[in-house]
Curated annotation (Swiss-Prot):
One of its GO terms (cellular component) is cytosol. CDD domains: GlnRS_core. Its main location: cytoplasm. Its EC number is 6.1.1.18. ATP binds at residues 51-53, 57-63, 254, 289-290. GO terms for biological process: glutaminyl-tRNA aminoacylation; glutamyl-tRNA aminoacylation. L-glutamine binds at residues 83, 235. Keywords: Aminoacyl-tRNA synthetase, ATP-binding, Cytoplasm, Ligase, Nucleotide-binding, Protein biosynthesis. This is Glutamine--tRNA ligase. It is found in: Cytoplasm.
């Protein structure tokens, strides 16, 4: 899916951001702008600015869909910008994974104009400009070098009930501040010896505005700039300036950055007054982050799961990471559909996991080819079927899409059926296979159970039946014998034997990390079960990330990591119904 398309569905849930953009378009807030080359700029430019210090998760997917989706819908553009200002935690591995995730979700930052530069940026590309702008703030008397330790700065900042106290270095002269800042840049000081702070208001009710740090010393190798810099700008300084440099119109953040918006405006307004930027400036808007039940998205918690081998890695199909849900079999379209359904609001709320699973289920129901898989096999022997013989049966690839054609598979004397489809002593209302009862083999014949084989412990190891030759599905005699039960099967000598991983929710508590609980206590011991299954023979040719509905079971995907040619491994993506609903 390209960034020019969106999944078909009912109208999207409410999105207050659209109202803001509509108002800006109506008043011409960002009309008539041009870039440095004189080319006209779109009236809507958004950006997705991840820090490359980990793998993206489902919450990031919402932000990606919001930013890229709005740009798409308003014929604008969205930039992918890496906020790579912390060299200690960042790595090109994460850069590559984020690029792959955005592309996989169906979006692109490439300009629609032929020959134009793709809008992929790094905050580190602006380090020279950021440094220059920091000096501009010093020269205007609104930034100073503070020589207190981080602990001292924190102690002097105050709290919600007490105002902060000014640093003893707050009134250094412009000349001294410039000298110290340049010496910081030149590597004359150790980490933590000095910081550059904005001079705003140590009594501000908003603690963010109590002389926030703009630059800190960090002698560390950067993944792009190497050892050129030993001072690095803070997020709040970098973010707004990067937006202005890139001509962003609507800077969309989650609610935790709401208190940072005054600082965003403060930096840009001071640089505008210094002649660096001009009106209209970018504006920051906040929307509610995605809180999903039965999941955690804390990077620290997810890392703990990986480090303690509670999961197999960042791409474990039970993880909420984009690489995890992709491996689980979720589709990009289902994620976009989910984000459209939950909408964008100003207030935090919890979205039930069933909403996400429902979007995945609806998307796959419309597209996934059908197939048969026996996950808990029990041998069924048709005693009156000729030995060594087989015949073809057929079924639609998709019952609602005849244009997808039909699939053909063999029936023989020995079959595999689901163990739960036989019961020697059935309860009332059980219409599947039991001694003396008739059922239909789906797409095949009506059969009558005649007996069982048992092992020394009395366990049923095989079921015997006779088939009724005139009752094959699709023939004139198909309805000659009425039965209530219908079971699926695969031919034993022809079946594709495969490993199938039955995944479920990683946690059995809807809020595993709430109220001081140890989230590890909420791990679901049934979140992964591995079985050896017997599948319709055609599944032997399944390629990685091919998706199917296993009839009566759910939706499955050929694992993109472990599947081999002729030997696929399947992951359960989601069941046919919500098994967690009350």
């Amino acid at each position: 899916m390209s960034h020019d398309t969106k999944p078909n569905d009912t109208p999207a849930a409410s999105n207050f951001l659209r109202s803001i953009i509509d108002q800006d378009l109506a008043t011409g807030t960002y009309a008539g702008r041009a870039d440095k080359q004189g080319d006209p700029l779109p009236t809507v430019i958004t950006r997705f600015p991840p820090e490359p210090n980990g793998y993206l998760h489902i919450g990031h997917a919402k932000s990606i869909c919001v930013n890229f989706g709005l740009a798409r819908d308003y014929a604008g553009r969205c930039h992918l910008r890496f906020d790579d200002t912390n060299p200690v935690k960042e790595d090109t591995e994460y850069v590559d994974s984020i690029i792959d995730a955005v592309h996989w979700l169906g979006f692109s930052w490439d300009s629609a104009q032929a020959g134009s530069t793709p809008h992929l940026y790094f905050a580190s590309d602006y380090f020279d400009q950021l440094y220059k702008f920091a000096e501009t703030l010093i020269e205007r008397g609104v930034a100073y070098v503070d020589s207190q330790s981080a602990e001292q700065i924190a102690a002097m900042r105050g709290n919600f009930s007490e105002p902060g106290k000014p640093s003893p270095f707050r009134d250094r002269s412009v000349e001294e501040n410039l000298k110290l800042f340049r010496e910081m840049r030149d590597g004359k000081y150790a980490d933590g010896e000095h910081v550059l702070r904005a001079k705003i208001d140590m009594t501000a009710p908003n603690i963010v505005m109590r002389d926030p740090v703009l630059y800190r010393i960090r002698h560390a190798h950067h993944h792009r700039t190497g050892d050129k810099w030993c001072i690095y700008p803070m997020y709040d300084f970098t973010h707004c300036i990067s937006d202005a440099i890139e001509n962003i119109t609507h800077s969309l953040c989650t609610l935790e950055f709401e208190n940072n918006r005054p600082l965003y405006d403060w930096v840009l307004e001071h640089l505008r007054d210094a002649g660096v930027f001009a009106n209209p400036l970018p504006h920051q808007y906040e929307f509610a982050r995605l809180n999903l039940t039965y999941a955690i998205t804390s990077k620290r918690r997810l890392k703990q799961l990986v480090d303690e081998q509670r999961v197999t890695g960042w791409d474990d199909p039970r993880m909420p990471t984009i690489v995890g849900i992709r491996r689980r079999g979720y589709t990009p379209e289902s994620i976009q559909l989910f984000c459209d359904r939950v909408g964008v609001s100003k207030a935090d709320s919890w979205i039930d996991m069933s909403t996400l699973e429902g979007a995945v289920r609806d998307d796959l129901d419309a597209r996934a080819p059908r197939s048969v898989a026996v996950l808990d096999p029990l041998k069924l022997i048709l005693d009156n079927y000729p030995e060594g013989q087989s015949e073809e049966c057929s079924a639609p690839v998709h019952p609602k899409q005849p244009e997808m054609g039909r699939r053909v598979f063999p029936l023989s004397r020995e079959l595999w059926i689901e163990r739960e489809d036989f019961n020697e002593n059935p309860p009332k209302g059980y219409f599947r296979l039991f001694p003396g009862n008739k059922v239909r083999l789906r797409y095949g014949y009506v059969i009558e159970c005649t007996g069982v084989d048992k092992d020394a412990d009395g366990n049923v190891i095989a079921v015997h039946a006779n088939y009724l030759p005139e009752t094959k599905s699709g023939t004139p005699g198909a309805d000659s014998v009425k039965v209530k039960g219908n079971i699926h099967w695969v031919s034993a000598p022809h079946a594709c034997e495969a490993e199938v991983r039955l995944y479920d929710r990683l946690f059995n508590d809807p809020n595993p990390d709430a109220g001081g609980k140890n989230f590890l206590d909420a791990l679901n011991p049934e979140s992964k079960k591995v079985v050896t299954a017997y599948l319709e023979p055609g599944l032997r040719d399944a390629k990685p990330e091919d998706r199917f509905q296993f009839e009566r079971h759910g939706y499955f995907v050929a694992d993109r990591v472990d599947s081999q040619p002729g030997k696929p491994v399947f992951n359960r993506t989601v069941g046919l119904k919500d098994s967690w609903g009350k």
